Every structure is written in structure tokens, then in C-alpha cells.
UniProtKB/Swiss-Prot annotation:
Component of the SET1 complex that specifically di- and trimethylates 'Lys-4' of histone H3. Together with su(sable), part of a transcription termination checkpoint that promotes transcription termination of aberrant RNAs and their subsequent degradation by the nuclear exosome. One of its GO terms (cellular component) is histone methyltransferase complex. One of its GO terms (molecular function) is chromatin binding. Belongs to the WD repeat SWD2 family. It comes from Drosophila melanogaster (Fruit fly). It comes from the Eukaryota. Component of the SET1 complex, composed at least of the catalytic subunit Set1, wds/WDR5, Wdr82, Rbbp5, ash2, Cfp1/CXXC1, hcf and Dpy-30L1. Interacts with male-specific lethal (MSL) histone acetyltransferase complex at least composed of mof, msl-1, msl-2 and msl-3. Interacts with su(sable). Its main location: nucleus. InterPro entries: G-protein_beta_WD-40_rep, Swd2/WDR82, WD40/YVTN_repeat-like_dom_sf, WD40_repeat_CS, WD40_repeat_dom_sf, WD40_rpt. Keywords: Nucleus, Repeat, Transcription, Transcription regulation, Transcription termination, WD repeat. This is WD repeat-containing protein 82. Pfam families: WD40.
Length: 317
């Protein structure tokens, strides 16, 4: 039985399960494409994997030596990539079932601030404060492509995995064709440069029509993916700590979810720009990560705690 996401259903979300596995803030989360598992990483150097069907924590893996950030499931079962917070700025490919590294991807000389995996194949993109964007293949430790940019780059693949977007210097979005990225971007959208904050994340909507820009301030932007036209600006949530708060789409691209430093989850209608709801969970600290499950009607949000949310209204049935 599929529930349709409408305003009343979104407002009915309540915390169904809270996990207190971490001793420091959770800095990244990622759902497996089939929606069955969620992976998280924290500043306490722990990687925690959750079972979304059972609503349980299934295992914990430590990354004490290198630290862990920007974690993503890869397409193979039980594997993930992540950036490092200690030693160096190498990206690491981890086998989760035996906690062994399968491969290292060295190259970046400063902190990696963006990491995304292709939705269709075993390639991934990384952006760093060294002002480069690198394209990688999981099967090779050598960088497959290198783009030198004029400022801090963040990246995202489109849902088809054919193009990628690079957000540069919090003021422009460049679109590249993956088959000919070495020719440079095929289009560049110039936006007004952020005065108060930096862009910290890009995401395409599932329908590929819009791009969501997250920041380390209290503003989220939505732009047209074909023309770069600004569509919406979402505000009215606090971020007084300058943290990179994640904004996410619902799978139907209709709603935008964001964390905040007030420990709540803020939700807007993507078409109208109107605030739909503010959800109160069991978050004593800033909520940095919020994502909607790609297959199940569930939402995850994280501060130091991890919260799983479920709708309590049947109206959308």
C-alpha cells in the first residue's frame, strides 16, 4: 500500500525510533538505493549501519585511524566510500562486513568537502578545498579526471548518471557531460554570490528538473536544472553555528526537508516555497543530516542521536 505524500501526511510524521549510538555529532548519512539500510558516520570516528525495515542498529565499524566523513554506500553489497578527517585527504573504499579497506584514492591535498557516487555505475566524484574536482572509478586508485576550478567545488550527479553539476565558489553551477567532461562544462549558470554563507551541497531532484543548494547559513536555494533560473529560496530556520546543514528532497520531488540548529526538522513545499511543517524530534543538538528514504515512507534525521520518523496519518492512502 503506497501512501502519497501530501501536506497532512508530512505534518503527521513522528519519531518512531531514536538511536543513541554516537558520542559526537553525526556528520553524514546515506540510504542504500533499495531503502533497506542507512549508513551514518560521526565525529566520534564510528560508522553505524541501520536496518530500516526492522528499525534496528545492525552494526558499528570504527575508523579511528583516518576518521570518517561524507559516507556513501556503493552499489556492491556491504561496501562504502568515505573521506578522511585525519592523517590525509585520501578517499577510502571500505568493505563493511569485515571492516577492511579495499582501495585508497589519493590525490586531494586539502579537505574533501563533497563526495557523490554515480546512480548507475561505479564511478564517483569528489570536490576539495584544493579547488579541484576529481572523477574516480572504484576499480582503480588513479583519478580518471581532474578539473581545476576557481573556488571551492561541490558536485552532484543527475538521476540518469549522464551529467554532473559542479557548484563553484558559491556563485555558479557548471554542468558537464560525463562522456566528454574534459571539454569543459556545456553550460554555466551564474547566480548571485552568497554574501552570508557558502554552498555546502548540491542535489538533483529525482525527476531531474531542479537542483537544491544547501548552505552553511540559514538559506536553501532551488534552481531550474535546465536554465539555472532561481525557483525558490527557503528560509526561516536557524543555523547560527555555520554548520553545513543538509537539505533533501522527498522522492517525489514535492517537498524539501532540512535540519536546523534548533534541533527540529523544517519542511517546505518545493512548488510554492511555503513552509509546510516544523517537526519536533528528540534532538538536543543541531540537526545536520536529514534524508528521506528512497523506497519506504520514512525520514531520518541526525544530531548526535539518529531519529527514524514515520507518518501517523493515513490520509494519503
Amino acid at each position: 500500500m503506497k501512501i502519497k505524500l501530501i501536506d497532512s501526511v508530512v505534518r503527521s510524521f513522528k519519531v518512531a525510533k531514536i538511536f543513541r549510538e554516537n558520542t559526537d555529532k553525526i556528520n553524514a548519512i546515506d540510504f542504500a538505493p533499495n531503502g533497506e539500510h542507512l549508513i551514518s558516520c560521526s565525529e566520534d570516528d564510528q560508522i553505524v549501519i541501520y536496518d530500516c525495515e526492522k528499525g534496528t542498529q545492525s552494526r558499528t565499524v570504527n575508523s579511528k585511524k583516518y576518521g570518517v566523513d561524507l559516507i556513501h554506500f556503493t552499489h556492491a553489497n556491504n561496501t562504502a566510500i568515505h573521506s578522511s578527517t585525519k592523517v590525509d585527504d585520501t578517499i577510502r573504499y571500505l568493505s563493511l562486513h569485515d571492516n577492511k579497506y579495499l582501495r585508497y584514492f589519493p590525490g586531494h591535498t586539502k579537505k574533501v568537502i563533497s563526495l557523490c557516487i554515480s546512480p548507475v555505475e561505479d564511478t564517483f566524484l569528489s570536490g576539495s578545498l584544493d579547488k579541484t574536482l576529481r572523477l574516480w572509478d572504484l576499480r582503480s586508485p588513479n583519478c580518471q579526471g581532474l578539473m581545476h576550478l576557481s573556488g571551492r567545488p561541490i558536485a552532484a550527479y543527475d538521476p540518469e548518471g549522464l551529467i554532473f553539476a559542479a557548484g563553484v565558489n558559491s556563485e555558479s553551477i557548471k554542468l558537464y557531460d560525463l562522456r566528454s567532461f574534459d571539454k569543459g562544462p556545456f553550460v554555466t549558470f551564474k547566480l548571485n554570490q552568497e554574501k552570508e554563507c557558502d554552498w555546502t551541497g548540491l542535489k538533483f531532484s529525482r525527476d531531474g528538473k531542479t537542483i537544491l543548494i544547501s548552505t552553511n547559513g540559514s538559506v536553501i536555494r532551488l534552481v531550474d536544472a535546465f536554465h539555472g533560473t532561481p525557483l525558490q529560496t527557503f528560509t526561516g530556520y536557524p543555523n547560527n553555528k555555520g554548520i553545513p546543514i543538509e537539505a533533501s528532497f522527498s522522492p517525489d520531488s514535492q517537498f524539501i526537508f532540512s535540519g536546523s540548529t534548533d534541533g527540529r526538522v523544517h519542511i517546505w513545499n518545493a512548488d510554492t516555497g511555503n513552509k509546510v511543517s516544523v517537526l519536533n524530534g528528540d534532538h538536543p543538538g543541531p540537526v545536520q543530516c536529514v534524508q528521506f528514504n528512497p523506497k519506504y515512507m520514512m525520514l531520518a534525521s541526525a544530531c548526535t542521536n539518529m531519529a527514524f520518523w514515520l507518518p501517523t496519518s493515513e490520509e494519503g492512502l
